[in-house]
């Protein structure tokens, strides 16, 4: 596996490989990779001749400068994992490489980006679309892989691809969880043992809600989840919504929308 730091060098490598008829898969990440990321990379490797994994902590999607500063950066360990997964390239550019000038583009995909996470983190999804569009333009992948854990982000990226006429396939990949049910996340490294235990109440409540929803109304299910999270130690609920998986708009009945894998962070 090669570690590449500039768009020019990566494009030169990909030009040669495309001339050989190879398809290119892209897995965009911010590093601090774990088994969940590995599942995306392995899927890309199985479906494409070449897999590029970007490792870039994108500053434009952070609302909190402290969160940006504290985000784990583990490039050496990330590269070892990527090599084990069979990736061809780790693309690890600098901020200056990706943003030689400030990106003033405004992406608006309302109502997809104005509800839930969009309401609590204004500007976040605009930053996500900025960097993802830059990666698509630079790499021109045939397929790009995103985890369903960030389900709202996945829906927004699908809409961006549709509106901007990108000629690629967006592949959503299932959530990967610890044995006890906690969804894998790079930020889990920042949790204390007690905070991690508290976080388990999120996935436990969501799995309970899946069964609960089969015999209760949307409002009853909403109330059950809200009360369970508020009663759990160390947790404060920001939002819980039951929505259509494509439009992210609230639904009147959850019977058609119950899923074997509740989406949570």
Show the residue positions of the predicted features.
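Nucleotidyltransferase catalytic core that binds NTPs
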Residues: 2-235, 242-247
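A structural signal for short secondary-structure junctions
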Residues: 233-234, 254-256
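Conserved active-site loop/cleft motifs that coordinate metal ions or position small ligands
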Residues: 238-241, 259
């Amino acid at each position: 596996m090669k570690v590449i730091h500039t768009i020019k060098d990566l494009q030169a490598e990909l030009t040669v490989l495309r001339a050989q008829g190879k398809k290119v898969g892209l897995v965009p990440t911010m590093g601090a990779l774990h088994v969940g990321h590995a599942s995306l990379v392995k899927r890309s490797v199985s479906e494409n001749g070449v897999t590029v994994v970007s490792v870039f902590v994108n500053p434009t999607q952070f609302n909190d400068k402290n969160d940006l500063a504290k985000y784990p950066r583990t490039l050496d360990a990330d590269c070892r994992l990527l090599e084990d997964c069979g990736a061809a390239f780790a693309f690890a550019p600098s901020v200056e490489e990706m943003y030689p000038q400030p990106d003033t583009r405004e992406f608006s995909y309302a109502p997809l980006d104005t509800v839930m996470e969009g309401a609590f983190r204004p500007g976040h999804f605009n930053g996500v679309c900025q960097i993802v569009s830059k990666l698509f333009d630079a790499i021109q992948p045939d397929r790009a892989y995103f985890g369903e854990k960030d389900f709202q982000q996945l829906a927004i990226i699908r809409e961006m691809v549709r509106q901007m006429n990108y000629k690629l396939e967006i592949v959503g990949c299932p959530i990967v969880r610890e044995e006890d049910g906690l969804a894998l996340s790079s930020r889990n490294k920042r949790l204390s043992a007690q905070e991690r235990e508290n976080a388990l109440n999120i996935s436990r409540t969501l799995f309970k809600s899946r069964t609960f929803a089969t015999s209760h109304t949307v409002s009853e299910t909403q109330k059950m989840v809200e009360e369970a999270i508020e009663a759990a130690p160390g947790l404060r609920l920001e939002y819980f919504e039951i929505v259509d998986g494509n439009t992210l708009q609230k639904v009147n009945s959850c019977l058609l929308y119950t899923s074997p894998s509740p989406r949570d962070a």
